[in-house]
Design a protein with these regions (language model features):
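Glycine-rich phosphate/ribose-binding loops and adjacent secondary-structure elements
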Residues: 2-6, 190-209
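Non-catalytic, usually N-terminal nucleic-acid engagement modules in DNA/RNA processing proteins
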Residues: 1-184
Length: 209
């Protein structure tokens, strides 16, 4: 049975389920069996009512998914950003049906705030920060319909790991670093992805900034 959940949501604001890397990996890797080990998930572990193998769980696949849902959210924070690198685990996203699906890309600002994406984000010439800045942009333009700007969270200065990894110690420094990202993206974007602004702030003064 192929249940179209998209049609059931026409009278509501569109809910965007956050597609996890874990979920996408199962769908993507199942498409490319290992020459030696075989399928990522062996047939013996596949439920009998999955008419189309693991593809039954791919809700972005209109013809083979057990259910279909058009809209979804996917984060650059757990994606393979190198668009020139073959990555089976990303196949659910990279090779989706663009005419019948819509995807919003989360930029990975949370990873910056938590110190996972290290670099001096205040410096537009920092190699580590620039690699992520450019990588997320290329990834967005290649695979996303809409995307969030690469914002530096206002709370990064309160995150010990984040402040240490990014060199950002104040709210204003976070704003300045976000502007660096925005300027780079505006200059180098292809226009394939439309970008949404992110409003940051922890109080009324920040919100008015």
């Amino acid at each position: 049975m192929n249940k179209d959940l998209t049609e059931a949501q026409q009278d509501y604001a569109h809910f965007l389920p956050a597609l996890s890397g874990f979920y996408a990996t199962y769908v993507g890797k199942q498409r490319y069996p290992d020459p030696v080990k075989g399928p990522y998930v062996p047939a013996s572990r596949m439920p009998n009512n999955f008419a189309n193998d693991m593809e039954s769980l791919n809700y972005l696949n209109k013809s083979e998914g057990a259910f279909q849902y058009k809209w979804t959210l996917y984060s650059a924070g757990h994606a393979e950003l190198d668009v020139n690198k073959f990555s089976p685990k990303e196949d659910m996203v990279r090779n989706r049906d663009r005419e019948n699906t819509w995807m919003l890309g989360d930029s990975g600002g949370f990873q910056i705030g938590k110190g996972v994406w290290e670099g001096d984000w205040k410096d537009p010439n920092c190699p580590k920060a620039q690699k992520k800045r450019d990588g997320v942009l290329r990834w967005m333009d290649a695979y996303m319909d809409y995307g969030m700007i690469l914002d530096i969270p206002a709370w990064v200065a309160r995150s010990p790991a984040g402040a240490k990894a990014t060199g950002i110690s104040t709210y204003q420094e976070a704003v300045a670093a976000t502007r660096i990202n925005n300027d780079y993206w505006m200059k180098h974007r292809t226009g394939a992805c439309k970008f949404l602004n992110v409003l940051q702030g922890e109080n009324h003064a920040d919100a008015d900034d």
